[in-house]
């Protein structure tokens, strides 16, 4: 899950922006 937070594309989904 750490990689998802680092990726700008998946960061939005992971952070639920």
From Swiss-Prot:
Keywords: Amphibian defense peptide, Antibiotic, Antimicrobial, Disulfide bond, Secreted. Disulfide bonds join 12-17. Expressed by the skin glands. GO terms for cellular component: extracellular region. The keyword Chaperone does not apply. It is found in: Secreted. GO terms for biological process: defense response to bacterium. It comes from the Eukaryota. Its main location: secreted. Belongs to the frog skin active peptide (FSAP) family. Ranatuerin subfamily. Antimicrobial peptide. This is Ranatuerin-2Ra. It comes from Pelophylax ridibundus.
């Amino acid at each position: 899950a750490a990689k998802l937070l680092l990726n700008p594309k998946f960061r939005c989904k992971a952070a639920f922006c």
